[in-house]
């Protein structure tokens, strides 16, 4: 089972089908539009476990979470929902003892009405699972996570994910609060990207105070805000106006020029960030040019998606960018994700493995 943004089930299914085919795992996706999840039916027993081990979760763009389904339980009686779930799990071989439990729903307005129930249900369900030795007495992040996903009041899927190959977040969504002093809600996109792409233990080194960043298409400053908040200095590139609160910090230099024409005055930029409303292929190529010229060490940018053929567009743009970087002898690590705060766009992160530019 794969969670995704409501309305992006086809993209998620297409991606999973491609990954499964590459692994020679045969099956087919089952989906309904606007449900916020995709099920992939494997033809062979044991292949669901193989998929969640061998598909690299951090290489999936449209999936927020994945777990192997052990059982589907429907028509749960209101007076005892626990026993049928325990019985269903007891009937299945190969379900590992888990170290944590997440009782979730897909991210749709309809399903979210069940979240209050999920919270109340978690404690008694946890105790019952511990009583049956299906869950460890103490929470452990070293062994699998048990997922119970309710898609309707009496209907759930029960399964497990591996902690070294899943999303660490409940429902696959980081819980972030909008900062009252941020100039726009877009600030949450960049904050979420930091949580998803950069391990927390590396934040002090890679998001360090005193670094320089460049924000292409910066106005009014939602993304610049995240760098300023971390005591960085920023070249903000936009013909529009920046929020005065950011300019007053003394950490921002505003350049009223075209983002495609700006060149940093000194080659001391660590972070290149970009949320321009432009054709995705054009933005991706611009990011590649900055990196191979050695103008930035890490790039984080959004690619706006077309109305149709969204998955194909994403694949093409990322493949073209990878080819461009390789041809120029640039070594890199690339991740892309359709983040919770993204809508008709995906966020891409590239880190230079070697900061020595061939140019």
UniProtKB/Swiss-Prot annotation:
Chief location:
cytoplasm
The record lists S-adenosyl-L-methionine as bound by: 186, 219-222, 238, 258, 275
Q: Name one GO biological process term.
A: rRNA processing
Enzyme Commission identifier(s): 2.1.1.186
Pfam families attached to this UniProt entry: FtsJ (PF01728), RlmM_FDX (PF18125), RLMM_N (PF21239)
Cross-referenced SUPFAM superfamilies: S-adenosyl-L-methionine-dependent methyltransferases (SSF53335)
From the record, give the cysteines joined by S-S bonds: none
Q: Where in the cell is it found?
A: Cytoplasm
Reaction(s) the record says it catalyses: cytidine(2498) in 23S rRNA + S-adenosyl-L-methionine = 2'-O-methylcytidine(2498) in 23S rRNA + S-adenosyl-L-homocysteine + H(+)
Tell me which InterPro entries the record gives: RlmM_FDX (IPR040739), RlmM_THUMP-like (IPR048646), RNA_MeTrfase_FtsJ_dom (IPR002877), rRNA_MeTrfase_M (IPR011224), SAM-dependent_MTases_sf (IPR029063)
Example GO molecular function: S-adenosylmethionine-dependent methyltransferase activity
The active site is formed by: 304 (proton acceptor)
Alphabetical keyword list? Cytoplasm, Methyltransferase, rRNA processing, S-adenosyl-L-methionine, Transferase
> Which Gene3D superfamilies has this protein been placed in?
3.30.2300.20, 3.30.70.2810, Vaccinia Virus protein VP39
Q: Which domain of life is it from?
A: Bacteria
Listed GO CC annotations: cytoplasm
Q: How does it assemble?
A: Monomer.
Q: Which family does it belong to?
A: Belongs to the class I-like SAM-binding methyltransferase superfamily. RNA methyltransferase RlmE family. RlmM subfamily.
PANTHER family recorded for this chain? Answer: RIBOSOMAL RNA LARGE SUBUNIT METHYLTRANSFERASE M (PTHR37524), RIBOSOMAL RNA METHYLTRANSFERASE FTSJ DOMAIN-CONTAINING PROTEIN (PTHR37524:SF2)
Function, as annotated, reads:
Catalyzes the 2'-O-methylation at nucleotide C2498 in 23S rRNA.
What this protein is called in its record is Ribosomal RNA large subunit methyltransferase M
Source species: Aliivibrio fischeri (strain ATCC 700601 / ES114)
